[in-house]
C-alpha cells in the first residue's frame, strides 16, 4: 500500500454520532453537577479508565505538552491530581499555572474540557492521599525521577526491589519530591456528539462567583 493509499483510508474513517443530544433546559446551574452525572454514566458504562484526563501544560517557550493523568478528587474547590514534583508538568506549572484538562469519553460520544489555574496541594492533603495508595505504588513513587533519561528499564526494577526491602517494615514515607495540584476551574465545556456533525456544545464560564452558560456552535 502506498503512502497516498494509506492517507486516503485514514481520511475516510468516520462514524455518525447518534447517542443523543444535549439541551439547554437539561443543564444544571453548576457545571460540576453535570460533570458528576456524566462521570457516573461513564463508570456505569464500564468505560476503561473513566477518570483518565489529558493534562495540557505549556513550557517557557510557549510549547504545549500533553499527557494522560488520573483525576483523584473533585469538588467546588477544583479538580485534583498527583504527580512527581520533578516532572515536566510540575516544572511547567511552577512557571505558568495555566492548565487545560480533557476527559475523552469516546464510547458515550462525549468530552469535557476544563480550563483554569493550578495550585499546589498542602502537605496534609498529599500525605493523606499518598498513604491511601497501594503499598507498591507508594514505593514506586520513590523509584522514578520522572522525565529524566534512563538507559534501561532494569534500572527501575532494581531500584524498586531495593526500596521494597528498605521499606519492608513500617510505613512508607512520603517522598519530598511527590505532591499534587488542584485546578481552580474557570471554564468547563461539555460536548455531546450529534447527527450530521451538528454537535451540542455548552460552555460554563465563571463570572462574579456565578456561572454563565452559553451554547457554542459545533
From Swiss-Prot:
One of its GO terms (molecular function) is FMN binding. Binds 1 FMN per subunit. Its EC number is 1.4.3.5. It catalyses: pyridoxamine 5'-phosphate + O2 + H2O = pyridoxal 5'-phosphate + H2O2 + NH4(+); pyridoxine 5'-phosphate + O2 = pyridoxal 5'-phosphate + H2O2. Substrate binds at residues 14-17, 72, 129, 133, 137, 197-199. Gene3D superfamilies: Electron Transport, Fmn-binding Protein, Chain A (2.30.110.10). It comes from the Bacteria. SUPFAM superfamilies: FMN-binding split barrel (SSF50475). Keywords: Flavoprotein, FMN, Oxidoreductase, Pyridoxine biosynthesis. FMN binds at residues 67-72, 82-83, 88-89, 111, 146-147, 191, 201. Pfam families: PNP_phzG_C, PNPOx_N. Pathway: Cofactor metabolism; pyridoxal 5'-phosphate salvage; pyridoxal 5'-phosphate from pyridoxamine 5'-phosphate: step 1/1; Cofactor metabolism; pyridoxal 5'-phosphate salvage; pyridoxal 5'-phosphate from pyridoxine 5'-phosphate: step 1/1. Its cofactor is FMN. InterPro entries: Pyridox_Oxase (IPR000659), Pyridox_Oxase_CS (IPR019740), Pyridox_Oxase_N (IPR011576), Pyridoxamine_oxidase_dimer_C (IPR019576), Split_barrel_FMN-bd (IPR012349). GO terms for biological process: pyridoxine biosynthetic process. Catalyzes the oxidation of either pyridoxine 5'-phosphate (PNP) or pyridoxamine 5'-phosphate (PMP) into pyridoxal 5'-phosphate (PLP). PANTHER family: PYRIDOXINE-5'-PHOSPHATE OXIDASE, PYRIDOXINE-5-PHOSPHATE OXIDASE. Homodimer. Belongs to the pyridoxamine 5'-phosphate oxidase family. This is Pyridoxine/pyridoxamine 5'-phosphate oxidase. It comes from Citrobacter koseri (strain ATCC BAA-895 / CDC 4225-83 / SGSC4696).
Amino acid at each position: 500500500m502506498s503512502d497516498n493509499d494509506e492517507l486516503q483510508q485514514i481520511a475516510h474513517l468516520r462514524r455518525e454520532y447518534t447517542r443523543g443530544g444535549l439541551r439547554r433546559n437539561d443543564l444544571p446551574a453548576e457545571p460540576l453537577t453535570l460533570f458528576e452525572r456524566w462521570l457516573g454514566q461513564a463508570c456505569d458504562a464500564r468505560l476503561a479508565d473513566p477518570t483518565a484526563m489529558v493534562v495540557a501544560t505549556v513550557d517557557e517557550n510557549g510549547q504545549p505538552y500533553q499527557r494522560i493523568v488520573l483525576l483523584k478528587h473533585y469538588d467546588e474547590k477544583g479538580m485534583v491530581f498527583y504527580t512527581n514534583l520533578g516532572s515536566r508538568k510540575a516544572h511547567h506549572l511552577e512557571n505558568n499555572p495555566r492548565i487545560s484538562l480533557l476527559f475523552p469519553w469516546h464510547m458515550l460520544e462525549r468530552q469535557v474540557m476544563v480550563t483554569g489555574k493550578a495550585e499546589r496541594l498542602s502537605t496534609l492533603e498529599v500525605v493523606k492521599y499518598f498513604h491511601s495508595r497501594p503499598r507498591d505504588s507508594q514505593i514506586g513513587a520513590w523509584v522514578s525521577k520522572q522525565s529524566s533519561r534512563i538507559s534501561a528499564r532494569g534500572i527501575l526494577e532494581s531500584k524498586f526491589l531495593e526500596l521494597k526491602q528498605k521499606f519492608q517494615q513500617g510505613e512508607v514515607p512520603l517522598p519530598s519530591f511527590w505532591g499534587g495540584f488542584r485546578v481552580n476551574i474557570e471554564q468547563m465545556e461539555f460536548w455531546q456528539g450529534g447527527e450530521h456533525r451538528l454537535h451540542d456544545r455548552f460552555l460554563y464560564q465563571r463570572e462574579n462567583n456565578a456561572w454563565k452558560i452559553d451554547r457554542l456552535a459545533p
